[in-house]
Amino acid sequence: MKIANFEVGNGKPFFLMSGPCVIESEQMAMDTAGYLAEVTKDLGINFVYKSSFDKANRSSINSFRGLGVDKGLEILAKVKKTYNVPVVTDVHEDTPFAEVAEVVDVLQIPAFLCRQTNFILEVCKQGKPVNIKKGQFLAPWDMQHVVTKAKSTGNEQIMVCERGVSFGYNNLVSDMRSLEIMKATGCPVVFDATHSVQLPGGQGSSSGGQREFVPVLSKAAMAVGIDGLFMETHPNPDEAKSDGPNSFPMYKIKEFLSLLKELDHLVKSQPKTEL
């Protein structure tokens, strides 16, 4: 499959989905998109800018959710035009799908909604590439049913994304086997390195996180030969309005991506060990 003008999967180099969790302001979106576009261009890594106009699943009613669909899409369209990069954003059950699909290049189904059949069908009917987050409550092989629903619309541009599995209360773990298992769906596999270290509800009215583990999990995922890496970034994670505790510090990303690119090339240039 293709996102914008680049191919995804089938042993191609990994692509990056990255940006702040939520659109906090137009200026911040432009600044982060510009920086990430420059870094990925220098490194030769295909890049999709990610940020959400609405975070509908925040822990608290008082949490910042975003700028809304109209302003959010206006900003994403400006990012896309200014920096010539594809964009991805979350959609929800009350999202005007056609309106969003006119702007973005990839529609993303949140993990909590990955079992909602009618929702999945409507999203996939838009004919855009779709990234489906695996629910924290699902086994990796259960994603086959989700993919079958999605592809029943005739849309073959489906990706599946691992973002950790619930491990007791307020904790997630990443089972690296799931990345290999989900390859059996026939879809490109994406690893969400930042939500995988989230501690859901771990701060009472908001989620905590362990961003110090993002590097090690990202490197482990590269060893599996993933097709894409999802990694939320922020110029100052401690001041982020959403998911700061698990966001990667943006100004440290270039050196780290350079390492991941080397690992990705090494793994994909070697024959698979069959047992």
Curated annotation (Swiss-Prot):
What pathway or pathways are given for this protein in its record? Carbohydrate biosynthesis; 3-deoxy-D-manno-octulosonate biosynthesis; 3-deoxy-D-manno-octulosonate from D-ribulose 5-phosphate: step 2/3; Bacterial outer membrane biogenesis; lipopolysaccharide biosynthesis
Question: Which InterPro entries does the entry mention?
Answer: Aldolase_TIM, DAHP1/KDSA, KDO8P_synthase
Q: What is its EC number?
A: 2.5.1.55
Among the GO biological process terms of this entry, one is: keto-3-deoxy-D-manno-octulosonic acid biosynthetic process
Spell out the subcellular localization from the entry.
Cytoplasm
What keywords tag this UniProt record? Cytoplasm, Lipopolysaccharide biosynthesis, Transferase
What GO terms fall under cellular component here?
Answer: cytoplasm
User: Membrane spanning segments where?
Assistant: none
Please classify the protein's predominant subcellular localization into one broad category. Answer: cytoplasm
* UniProt-recorded Gene Ontology molecular function terms: 3-deoxy-8-phosphooctulonate synthase activity
A Pfam family recorded for this sequence:
DAHP_synth_1
Catalytic activity annotated for this protein?
D-arabinose 5-phosphate + phosphoenolpyruvate + H2O = 3-deoxy-alpha-D-manno-2-octulosonate-8-phosphate + phosphate
Family membership noted in the UniProt record: Belongs to the KdsA family.
User: Could you tell me what this protein is called?
Assistant: 2-dehydro-3-deoxyphosphooctonate aldolase
